[in-house]
Amino acid sequence: MRKLLLVIFALGCLATGVVIHDGALSASQDIPRESKVQPKEVVLGKDSQSDKYGEVPFNHETHSTKNYSVDGAGVLGCVECHHTDQPAAALKPPLKTSERDVVLTAAALAAADAKPVKSCRTCHLQAGDDSATIPTVTYAGKTTPTKLTNEVSYHLNCNVCHDKAIAARPALKGKVPGSNDCLPCHKPVS
């Protein structure tokens, strides 16, 4: 009977998206291709190609509602990560793609006529996925373009933001992972 209850509990967790992270229950979800609903938490890199570093549980709600801006004075703007969700005039190099006439905000997303937000993987595919053209950028001083795969894009975006926050607020050092601190974010591959 006990085994049956455990099986039913496990199946219920799978069906509702409840998972256990380090012994704590949390609601996590797969990242849909596009959505008008902000997730609480998503798991990035479920298909990580690294033999050392695995997935990254990412708390979207915390990053989008707390004072996580570089200077700590406000919340992050949606376009800090969802960079295509702003007007073309607002884009800063090397960004080129714009998919909105207004800057994405939580209020704009809640509007009845708002377009859904696309997932990163819509453009930034996993290395080796040739189903679409992966964006590239040639950085100043470089001759070879960098292919902005999903992994490269996440690392650039997350690391640059974290490093800038640590530089702006030295008290964060050791509390917020920087570019060289992999395991605070990544689960080790077992």
Across the structure, where does each feature detected by a protein language model lie?
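Short, low-complexity, Pro/Ser/Thr/Gly-rich segments in the mature regions of secreted, periplasmic
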Residues: G178-V189
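Positively charged n-region of N-terminal signal peptides that target proteins for export
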Residues: M1-L4
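Bacterial N-terminal signal peptides
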Residues: V7-G17
